[in-house]
Amino acid sequence: MQSPYVREAVREMDLPDEVIVYDTTLRDGEQTPGVSFTPEQKLEIAHLLDELGVQQIEAGFPVVSEGERDAVRRIAHEGLNADILCLARTLRGDVDAALDCDVDGVITFIATSELHLKHKLRMSREEVLERIADTVEYAKDHGLWVAFSAEDGTRTEFEFLERVYRTAEECGADRVHATDTVGVMIPAAMRLFVAKIREVVDLPIGVHCHDDFGMAVANSLAAVEAGAQAISTTVNGIGERAGNAALEEVIMALKELYGIDPGFNTEVLAELSRKVSEYSGIDVPPNKAVVGENAFRHESGIHVAAVLEEPRTYEPIDPKEVGMNRKIVLGKHTGRKAVVAKLEELGVEPEEEIVEEVLKRIKALGDRRVRVTDSKLEEIVRNVLESRGDRDDPGSR
């Protein structure tokens, strides 16, 4: 059930009919310190992204290594529905590496802020413009779809950024990216930024946001509110430093809050999240939105009673919609209805005396910070029944 205020706000927005998700788990996600996917793992993740319905998959950075090229090439040859892209610096050699992988397109980038020009590239603005023109034209001449990203664009003076984007457009780029490389934007600023870009180029705009201030998803959605038509994501929000905009959060927010749904098979999200967590070695926080272990778990007696009556009272998303399950957790906040529901699951008649005694023991364990698992509950119920002279095993009913 959507908030009436969200409905009212969205009605007043000039939203795009469709938003393209170009997922970079296999490239930017793999740049998470300590993460390295095998080619087989990359292929499996790519298949799950494709099953989800992601329109574009950024499969890697081919110039990095021969192993990376092999992995990108395998994904490109897999016959997926998604367009397969890869990253390329504004260098012909990087484009050649992409061509060698048979990808559909490239995301080519160069830094544009004075900070990067002075301390990293040691290049003039004119040299940057020349590199953009040469690389975009070269990639287009060789039949590639091309997106251009101005690295650290959100810290670049717009006077120069306008020239950057116009150069990319004039040389044939298919899309330009508003890139918040170090996550310094706020939603209001991102809306302003995208609006300014729309004034100077007649191309679709994508957005690539990092999460250094925890704003990647909010900034990505703000960009869509301002007319951006593509969002860069990673599964579980993994990526350099604090990570990127989380795929699962972006997709569900677009669908449930903005009414933008190109037909994603969202039931795949939980499996995809678990697989990326397993292969990356990065645990999903239990309170992670959409796919965290606690996202659909309830302990408070008041909440459990309401959820059992009408799930929407405390669940803005149906857990099955994202491949998750609702879980009633027992602890010191547990109420009678949760115990009744659990007893019924075990096939035990929820008589008043049994419910009260089980509830008392659960709360006592909760006060001692003992987690009441399903097996622990069965033990409690068994002891309560035995104390009443009933020897049946509740777990076998």
UniProtKB/Swiss-Prot annotation:
Residues 19-270 form the Pyruvate carboxyltransferase domain. Keywords: Transferase. Pathway: Organic acid metabolism; 2-oxosuberate biosynthesis. Its EC number is 2.3.3.14, 2.3.3.-. Pfam families: HCS_D2, HMGL-like. GO terms for biological process: biosynthetic process; carboxylic acid metabolic process. It comes from the Archaea. It is an enzyme of class 2 (transferase). It catalyses: acetyl-CoA + 2-oxoglutarate + H2O = (2R)-homocitrate + CoA + H(+); 2-oxoadipate + acetyl-CoA + H2O = (R)-dihomocitrate + CoA + H(+); 2-oxoheptanedioate + acetyl-CoA + H2O = (R)-trihomocitrate + CoA + H(+). Transmembrane segments: none annotated. InterPro entries: AIPM/Hcit_synth_CS, Aldolase_TIM, LEU1_arch, LeuA/HCS_post-cat, PYR_CT. One of its GO terms (molecular function) is homocitrate synthase activity. Catalyzes the condensation of alpha-ketoglutarate and acetyl-CoA to form (R)-homocitrate. Can also catalyze the condensation of alpha-ketoadipate with acetyl-CoA to form (R)-homo(2)citrate, and the condensation of alpha-ketopimelate with acetyl-CoA to form (R)-homo(3)citrate. These reactions are part of the biosynthesis pathway of coenzyme B and biotin. Belongs to the alpha-IPM synthase/homocitrate synthase family. This is Homocitrate synthase AksA.
